[in-house]
């Protein structure tokens, strides 16, 4: 809802002129906008903005519509683009009697616009049109424009994310704070998974096996049936869709990461966890060489505060100290009886503090395989053979404010239990752990360099 002070501003200030351009898209983003309630769509276009051009909604058509577009070029306006652009093979989209390509019209409008907003995943990153093999060579508009573009991804984005981003510029005359992908931080700055109403079940290792099972109906996590929430940055659980009616995960289907780059190829079209057995594309993570952590990276770990308990029996006991953790350990025990029995047989209850990076990998290997890690290269090979690009998040805690950097990994072992119960395989766990170490060591290295 727009605050009273902002509403007063919109009442007395000249209305911001808005041009809404359609390129390679399905009009789903416009559909999302039409379902706004506070403000309603009619309030939005009559009281807050002056909608100068929108091919689906405007009364004018044909040459009259083209005349309106030419006229608006002489005035101040902001540009919202729905849909990707075919900038190479431009014949994939031609518009109007003059046969202009979508790319030509986009360039013409972008050159005059005070601000440019890519509304939806198609205009932000190319979207479904850019899915393999991408015959139209569609891409996001920022790839072909020299001007700054604010990305509002989603297939579609919520009405709130669209309206609030446009309204911010109309109110303040500047763009909102953006992340490294030029997305508004207020909307895309947090992981969707962390706001999900099903997260407690995720933390407990309670997963739906099928969409129609009792667990799913009772709020179980949908990770095992393909939810990609842990890899997605969006505020869907908070703002929802259709005037805050609901959102996909609450309605019973997993997130498909529709606001992420290349979502259709990398996330969206399979309802399984990202385990190698479900991969439909062959990918070798070439950056994970045999020397991945053998030299400089391990030296950095040796120079910082890095210590953890390495007795797995005690690790499991610590995880089980709270209600969610106790459920998680119990579910791990049920799903991996052999592994749990191996731990019970081979570990006592004496503390075993360790600073050894390889010991962390060995613990993780035991949790996955129920056996000791005989060759440390087996872990690296598994990570290299992971057939997906995206690591599953591990909650390492890096404190850069201490006398020397401190990397706390003590609570992260539970993530291995969670992912195993959720259907992730050894390759996925191995890759995710190594990427977590790599990312944190990179932060430490950058601090040392500065």
Describe the residue ranges of each PLM region.
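Gly/Thr-rich phosphate-binding beta-strand-loop-beta motif of the actin/hexokinase/Hsp70
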Residues: 286, 290-303
